[in-house]
Amino acid sequence: AIESLMDELAEKLDMEPMVLREKNAAVEGTQRPNGTKVGVTGNEAVMRAVVESPHYRSELAGPWRGRGVALGFWGANSGVHAVNATVNNDGRVILTTGAVDIGGLRAVEAQVMAEVLGIAYDEVTPRYGDTDGIGYSGLTAGSGTGSGISASVMHAAEQIRDRMTERAAAIWGVDVKDVNYDSKTGVMSTTVGEARSMTFKELAGRQQATGGYISGHVDLGGATGAATYGGHIVDVEVDPETGKTTILR
């Protein structure tokens, strides 16, 4: 409806519709009706791609034919999600989140945690939390929950990885920067002094006696809202007797 109104306004102003759109395009820093400002945006880039396309520049001959252009965006806001993750003595990671699983979300969470830490997928146990045990988590809907919860899980996993690295350094008596954490195998190693290595599971079994249990906690994650833009160009032909509209291109 907005795009139809833009075309009507362009007609009243006797202006090319795409020129009107370009003159009024929202750009980075534009104030939005809700009080926030537009961040990085592909709005103008999409407009340029439309007007520079061979389709837009081609001739459309013949009666009862017309060309329509419409632009649109989708707010890809993935929300905020709280995550708690704890390393057990047996090397398993207990992952507690607040987003409801309606189709594979826990599998995604476990995959992200396992990939960052270099442990097996089945060594991560995803669980639901509630308002007594976990921070705020957005609703599960649309296309944003997976990316939003993945960002939170990734940051929690990185906290665990860093703390495991620090613990290994303390056990070996070396500087943290001298410990390498292999995210493909979950093995920590150092070549300072005597070459030594330790698996994620081995260190997990020693955590209580070497400084306490290791965990990760994230309140928000790193996925922020942004809009994705797109444009369509369509050529149609209308039958004046029946009103049937045929898409030509």
Predicted regions: what they are:
Residues 119-121:
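Proline-centric
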Residues 6-7:
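Amphipathic alpha-helical segments within well-ordered protein domains
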Residues 11-13, 17-117, 129-249:
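Cofactor-centric catalytic regions
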